[in-house]
Amino acid sequence: MILAILALVIATFLYGGATTVQAGCRDTLTSLSPCLYYLNGGSSSPSWSCCRQFSTVVQSSPECLCSVVNSNESSFYGFKFNRTLALNLPTACNVQTPSPSLCNTGGNVPTTLPANTPVGSPRSAPSPSGTTSPANTPSGSKKFPLSNESSSKSNVIILSFVSIALVLAII
């Protein structure tokens, strides 16, 4: 009898924890609704609000990306979107995505990006005189860091992430 009660308590705890994570990611993914118009081919580039929200989600909730990292679908729950545009979202928004290897840590995915995650490559910056000169600081902003050259695997994460966001926005 004690073992049955213990099993029930553990099952309730585990189920409740999973619901909390899903609800958190569901809310996070639905916050990408400003990207829907772009992802359905309604515009040639994502809106500023889409990119801002996408960057915020990538920076604050990369664990939500892992829930869909292995998905190769271009539709969820009957909602279809342009897969090519979804794969291009990090580039179109100049947002660097976390490495997909972070999702393969046995469930121990960080809830924020590591402190040493690079934000881009050097770019020209205005000098005090107003002219442009090379700078040794990362380019882009904290909200919109530049994508690195080897982001093809990261694009898979983003595609999956955006796919779930689109589905959840409709539901």
Swiss-Prot record:
Subcellular location: Cell membrane
Disulphide bridges: 25-66, 35-50, 51-93, 64-103
Protein keywords: Cell membrane, Disulfide bond, Glycoprotein, GPI-anchor, Lipoprotein, Membrane, Signal
Region Disordered, residue ranges: 113-149
InterPro entries listed in its UniProt record: Bifun_inhib/LTP/seed_sf (IPR036312), Bifunc_inhib/LTP/seed_store (IPR016140), LTSS (IPR043325)
Cellular component aspect of the GO annotation: plasma membrane; side of membrane
Propeptide, residue positions: 148-171
Glycosylation sites: 72, 82, 148
Lipidation (GPI-anchor amidated serine): 147
Biased composition (Low complexity): 118-141
Membrane protein topology class: Lipid-anchor; GPI-anchor
Signal peptide: 1-18
Family: Belongs to the plant LTP family.
Function (record text): Probable lipid transfer protein.
PANTHER family according to UniProt: BIFUNCTIONAL INHIBITOR/LIPID-TRANSFER PROTEIN/SEED STORAGE 2S ALBUMIN SUPERFAMILY PROTEIN-RELATED
Name the UniProt record assigns to this protein: Non-specific lipid transfer protein GPI-anchored 19
Gene source species: Arabidopsis thaliana (Mouse-ear cress)
